[in-house]
Every structure is written in C-alpha cells, then in structure tokens.
C-alpha cells in the first residue's frame, strides 16, 4: 500500500491552462485612421475633382460619370474635346437640368444647368 501511495505522489501535476490570453501582435486600431468617406451619391470620382456638395449643384467628370444635383438629369459631355493630347486635363462637362440619357448638352447656356442632354 505504501508503494502505491508513493507512486501517486510522484506523478507530475496536470498542466494548467494560462489565465491570460496571449497578446496580439498588431494593435486593435491603426495609428492613423483614414477619414470617413461621404456617401457615394454625393461624390464624384477622385479623378474628376473629388466631392460635390448638395448646394453647389454637383460636378461632372470628363467622361460624364460624375454627379449632379438631385433635381438634375445627370452629366453630359462637353462639346470641345481633344483626343490627340494625352494629358489628363480637366474638361468641363455640364450637368443637365432635365432628365435625359444623351451624351451631349443641348439647350441654352454653358453653365452647370444647360437645359438637358440630347
């Protein structure tokens, strides 16, 4: 009996699980947080001048893929385009004041609201 008792005492103790989890190698937050992006509907693409405010009537990219005010009908391409020059020159495209699916501006004036697209 004494031999069995001594064998039980000589057994190694069970391994204990660590109380604290290991530390993560990366911090939870990045050192510099990027600015929050405004909604996509109120922004133009980065190449076309950034964001456009709701009160400014909107802005259009050179390819007509920008944004206009909610009352407008979208963007239409400007008439004067140079295809030979490979420079990324900002070309003025107008916003239509009437909903239409055209690619060129029609109507009077050469402002942001030129009557619609045709």
UniProtKB/Swiss-Prot annotation:
Belongs to the LCE cluster present on 1q21. GO terms for molecular function: identical protein binding. Belongs to the LCE family. It comes from Homo sapiens. Pfam families: LCE (PF14672). GO terms for biological process: keratinization. Keywords: Keratinization. This is Late cornified envelope protein 1F. Induction: By UVB. Signal peptide: none annotated. Precursors of the cornified envelope of the stratum corneum. InterPro entries: LCE (IPR028205). Residues 1-23, 82-118 are annotated as: Disordered. Skin-specific. Expression was readily detected in adult trunk skin, adult arm skin, fetal skin, penal skin, vulva, esophagus and tongue. Not expressed in the cervix, rectum, lung, colon, or placenta. Expression is observed in the fibroblasts. Residues 11-23 have a biased composition (Pro residues). Residues 105-118 have a biased composition (Gly residues). Residues 1-10, 95-104 have a biased composition (Low complexity).
């Amino acid at each position: 009996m004494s031999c069995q008792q001594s064998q039980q005492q000589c057994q190694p103790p069970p391994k204990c699980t660590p109380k604290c989890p290991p530390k993560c190698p990366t911090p939870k937050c990045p050192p510099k947080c990027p600015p929050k992006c405004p909604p996509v509907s109120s922004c133009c693409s980065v190449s076309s001048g950034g964001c456009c405010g709701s009160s400014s009537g909107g802005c259009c990219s050179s390819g007509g893929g920008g944004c206009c005010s909610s009352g407008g009908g979208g963007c239409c391409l400007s008439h004067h385009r140079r295809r030979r020059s490979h420079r990324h020159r900002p070309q003025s495209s107008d916003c239509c004041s009437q909903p239409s699916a055209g690619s060129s501006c029609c109507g009077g004036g050469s402002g942001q609201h030129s009557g619609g697209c045709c």
